[in-house]
UniProtKB/Swiss-Prot annotation:
Signal peptide residue numbers: none
UniProt xrefs under InterPro entries: DDI1_N, Peptidase_A2_cat, Peptidase_aspartic_DDI1-type, Peptidase_aspartic_dom_sf, UBA, UBA-like_sf
Organism, scientific name: Saccharomyces cerevisiae (strain ATCC 204508 / S288c) (Baker's yeast)
PANTHER family: ASPARTYL PROTEASE DDI-RELATED, AT13091P
Effect of D220A: Increased protein secretion most likely due to reduced catalytic activity. Cells are larger and clump together
Description of how the protein assembles with itself and partners: Forms homodimers. Interacts with RAD23. These interactions are mediated by the UBA domain. Is also able to bind ubiquitin and polyubiquitinated proteins. Interacts with the SNAREs SNC1, SNC2, SSO1, TLG1 and TLG2. Binding to SSO1 is promoted by the phosphorylation of 'Ser-49' of SSO1 by TKP1.
Name the record gives this protein: DNA damage-inducible protein 1
Length: 428
């Protein structure tokens, strides 16, 4: 490697001097004593503003020296001056370094290769402190084996906090630093003992078929209803079967507009065909299998075997390589559904001539605790022995499916007023 030596006492520059990177520092000192007028009793050798201990036996490579680096020969500093430098505040230390760069053209020429725009920064004290201050302070404290203070914060701040630890603001700051220490300790332990916690877990997908069209379905036990996208409804030919009377809003982490509902479609999982109803949303994911379908068919999510057991068949969850990356983005998370069927249905031109279909029951908006419907509704209701009132419109819709009024009211009572669950109970 090539090194340049600058003697600031005489103004002379030596080099580049070609030396081996494996040369010991003591050998380099001996070379400088012979050729550059270096005297260990009067001079110090500087590298990157740090004094190199002339008694070290480490190689130049181990000390971090590289080709084209600059070494400075300066006069020894008295102990009192060294003590003053050690007691400088962080801002004063940064300013001292800036002044050193202003007065030392050789050092500035070396650092400008590593710090673009250094000439402009040196001439602006405020910008210099803002841009290079953190790096200079890191260099100042980085040479110690342990942090200058237990919190690893600037020494000025630590001194201020410890000077009056009972001050409310200081006490709050100290508590924050202690909490951060605990968080950092937890992070280190987690990285060391449970690194798998930092890997991304693939979502649960299975292969299904709808109208002979293969689909990768997302299994979500946290979703209340099973969802199909409008795009897939068109591809599978089910868009004409969407009951648009069930327009509403899906609510979860966000909200989504419900286009309607497909009351029944055959879904093939492995060799088994099972009936399924879909809430149709304009979403990016094709199919989301929710809790309604999973509970109806007594599904079991077996994460140990990585399979889904449903309707007496078993299908494997897809591996991460089998899941398109686009599927991982923008997953809908509706957990509750509010439809316009809470209001009396208004027949449309396309639906007025159609008789009610089995299962065509409005999904009422979930209520906290599944409590009774407010009595202030415009439609009359049936009151049970417990004083619970059900909307007359809901009772009529269930009776239109061919069930007597007493059975409808009983089913609504058993399902806490949920019309969809009541219909499922009546059909059993």
């Amino acid at each position: 490697m090539d090194l340049t030596i600058s003697n600031e006492l005489t103004g002379e520059i030596y080099g580049p001097i070609e030396v081996s990177e494996d040369m010991a520092l003591t050998d380099l000192i001996a070379l400088l004593q012979a050729d550059c007028g270096f005297d260990k009793t009067k001079h110090d050798l500087y590298y990157n503003m740090d004094i190199l201990d002339s008694n070290r036996t480490q190689s130049l490579k181990e000390l971090g020296l590289k080709t084209d680096d600059l070494l400075l020969i300066r006069g020894k500093i008295s102990n009192s001056i060294q003590t003053d430098a050690a007691t400088l505040s962080d801002e004063a230390f940064i300013e001292q370094f800036r002044q050193e760069l202003l007065n030392n053209q050789m050092l500035r020429s070396q650092l400008i290769l590593q710090i673009p725009g250094l000439n402009d920064l040196v001439n602006d004290p405020l910008l210099f402190r803002e841009r290079l201050g953190p790096l200079i302070l890191q260099r100042r404290y980085g040479g110690y084996n342990t942090a200058m203070n237990p919190f690893g914060i600037p020494q000025d701040e630590y001194t201020r906090l410890m000077a009056n630890p009972d001050d409310p603001d200081n006490k709050k700051r100290i508590a924050e630093l202690l909490d951060q220490q605990a968080i950092d300790e937890q992070l280190r332990n987690a990285i060391e003992y449970t690194p798998e916690m930092f890997t991304q877990v693939p979502m649960l997908y299975i292969n299904i078929e709808i109208n002979n069209y293969p689909v990768k379905a997302f299994v979500d036990t946290g979703a209340q209803t099973t969802i199909m996208s409008t795009r897939l409804a068109k591809k599978t030919g089910l868009s004409r079967m969407i009951d648009k009377r069930f327009i509403g809003e899906a609510r979860g982490v966000g909200t989504g507009k419900i286009i309607g509902r497909i009351h029944q479609a055959q879904v093939k999982i492995e060799t088994q065909y099972i009936p399924c109803s879909f809430t149709v949303l304009d979403t990016d994911i094709d199919v989301l299998i929710g809790l309604d379908m999973l509970k109806r068919h007594l599904a079991c999510v077996d994460l140990k075997e990585n399979v889904l057991r449903i309707a007496e068949v078993e299908t494997s969850f897809l591996s991460e390589a089998e899941i398109p990356k686009s599927f991982q983005e923008g997953l809908p998370a509706p957990t509750s559904v509010t439809t316009s069927s809470d209001k009396p249905l208004t027949p449309t031109k396309t639906s007025s001539t159609l008789p009610p279909q089995p299962g065509a029951v409005p999904a009422l908006a979930p209520r906290t605790g599944m409590g009774p419907t407010p009595t202030g509704r415009s439609t009359a209701g049936a009151t049970t022995a417990t004083g619970r009132t059900f909307p007359e419109q809901t009772i009529k819709q269930l009776m239109d499916l061919g069930f007597p009024r007493d059975a409808v009211v009983k089913a609504l009572k058993q399902t806490n007023g949920n019309a969809e669950f009541a219909a499922s109970l009546l059909f059993q």
